[in-house]
Amino acid sequence: MKIYDISQEVFGCQVYAGDPMPEKELLSSMENGDLYNLTAFRMCAHNGTHVDAPLHFIQGGKAVDSIDLDAFIGMAYVAEHHGIVSADDAAAILEKVKKQNPEAAKRILIKGDAEVSSESAKVFAASNMFLLGNESQTVGPPNAPMEVHRILLGAGVVLLEGIRLAEVSQGVYFLNAAPLNLSGADGSPCRAVLITAER
């Protein structure tokens, strides 16, 4: 079994423009004579590697603690793509995955500097998939991500953003990207990993 950590380190992570940076504060320090070390931290729900719940862009949408965990845990497919993902590209990815492993078609991770278009978002949304992941801090065009988010989240497709797939080849894996159990939250950081039977 081989485990790929596809998460960013939180305090050195990439942050979407305008979002606050993660911060940590040492409240107690054994080095300073305290009995124990104790750290407090503050961060945005969408810092680093994180999931977007429908509530992020859909008024009345599901919060992160209301989403079934099987959306984040199960067979997944890593597809490499660079540039804009067209509707035809999305359809081709889905067709290829369904032939290899129909269960993996429910969770697709896009490797590369891909930008999901509104047209491809509609194709993914219509496929009844659970999760779409990408390496960028936002799944849509960086200067106008709202429409793509609304299409996908409105269809109940959760988003896994800010993953790191440089060490991962295309193919089928087991994904665990469970979010923290944050009541009423529109998103959550997660420690996303891919697992394969190969060593």
Label each PLM-derived region with a short phrase:
Residues M1-R199:
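Active-/binding-site microenvironments in catalytic and ligand-binding cores
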